[in-house]
């Protein structure tokens, strides 16, 4: 297949963000490209790298790390010893499981400029996220990067879901129809894989998976873990009613009486006196702590809308937060 069809990270790198998320079709070459890039940086500039997976068992075959990219560097010796990577006899990088990040706190990595975290979004058949996973990655980044400027962490994933601990933690709501969603210090890239998909459909395996859910992810870069049920932008006639603060997120609740629908959105009226929270962690001035939603008119209406199917959510992230909220309210 033509090399130009595969993923090229140069545009993403040009934005120079410290934290980057690349979510692309399976087989498009994300992992391959993000092996080649740090190898080149080491050969040219002596910059080291760290390769991260979530758990130790995922690094069981790390000895094969260089196998697929060795052809790109015929004049260099690429060797793996344990969880260390060597290029031309010099230490170039480390493989680290995120689950043991605490053991790295006392280590120093002054020459590491790139961290690559592969498969940062959990797939259905994989192991769970580790507890406080985003904080674990941030701790690792802090240990490695310290206060240096020319550094970056690149997180790779197949198109599984835009609802994940990382986007929730940083309150990132990407437009899945845009290739680059750029924020102050972070970036989300969703590569266009149309030409790649067209060519891959011509292969025997491509024909096999075409039209299946797996094919939607692998060929079309569709987020197969994200249902569109109840996802709907609020109507122009909807009116703001109240806000709920949950896990640091402020959710605005809107009502369209003509359509008989209620909406949850990030948009809200900051001057409203109707602000509720369910936890003391979120409680602040000018908020009401609600321990039983049945005792509050607004939350009873919200629960009723949810249970009767006339509640809508602005996007996948908002829906995920709201579902956690309803579980907290003991509404299943």
UniProtKB/Swiss-Prot annotation:
Domain of life of the organism encoding this protein: Viruses
InterPro entries documented for this protein: P-loop_NTPase, Podovirus_Gp16
Any coiled-coil regions, as ranges: none
Keyword Isomerase: no
E.C. code: 3.6.4.-
Enzyme class: hydrolase
BP GO annotations: viral DNA genome packaging
Effect of substituting residue 330 to Q: Decreased packaging
Reported effect, residue 119 to D: Complete loss of DNA packaging activity
Protein name per the record: DNA packaging protein
UniProt organism field: Bacillus phage phi29
Organismal lineage: Viruses, Duplodnaviria, Heunggongvirae, Uroviricota, Caudoviricetes
């Amino acid at each position: 297949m033509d090399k130009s069809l595969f993923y090229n990270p140069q545009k993403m790198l040009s934005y120079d963000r410290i934290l980057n998320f690349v979510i692309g079709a399976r087989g498009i070459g994300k992992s391959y490209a993000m092996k080649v890039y740090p190898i080149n940086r080491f050969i040219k500039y002596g910059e080291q790298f760290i390769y991260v997976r979530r758990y130790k068992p995922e690094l069981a075959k790390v000895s094969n790390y260089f196998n697929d990219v060795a052809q790109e560097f015929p004049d260099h010796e690429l060797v793996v010893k344990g969880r260390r990577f060597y290029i031309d006899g010099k230490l170039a990088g480390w493989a680290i499981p995120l689950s043991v990040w605490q053991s790295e706190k006392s280590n120093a990595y002054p020459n590491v400029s790139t961290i690559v975290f592969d498969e940062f979004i959990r797939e259905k058949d994989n192991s769970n996220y580790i507890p406080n996973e985003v904080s674990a990655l941030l701790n690792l980044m802090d240990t490695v990067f310290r206060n240096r400027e020319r550094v970056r962490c690149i997180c790779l994933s197949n198109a599984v879901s835009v609802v994940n601990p990382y986007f929730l933690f940083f309150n990132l709501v990407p437009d899945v129809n845009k290739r680059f969603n750029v924020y102050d210090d972070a970036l989300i890239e969703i590569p266009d894989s149309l030409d790649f998909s067209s060519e891959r459909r011509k292969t025997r395996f491509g024909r096999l998976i075409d039209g299946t859910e797996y094919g939607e992810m692998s060929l079309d870069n569709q987020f197969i873990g994200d249902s569109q049920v109840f996802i709907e932008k609020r109507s122009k006639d909807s009116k703001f009613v109240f806000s709920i603060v949950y896990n640091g997120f402020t959710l605005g609740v809107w009502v369209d009486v003509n359509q008989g629908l209620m909406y949850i959105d990030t948009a809200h009226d900051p001057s409203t006196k109707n602000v509720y929270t369910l936890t003391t962690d979120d409680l602040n001035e000018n908020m009401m702590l609600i321990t039983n939603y049945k005792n509050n008119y607004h939350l009873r209406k919200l629960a009723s809308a949810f249970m009767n199917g006339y509640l809508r959510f602005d996007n996948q992230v908002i829906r995920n937060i709201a579902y956690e909220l309803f579980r907290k309210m003991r509404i299943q």
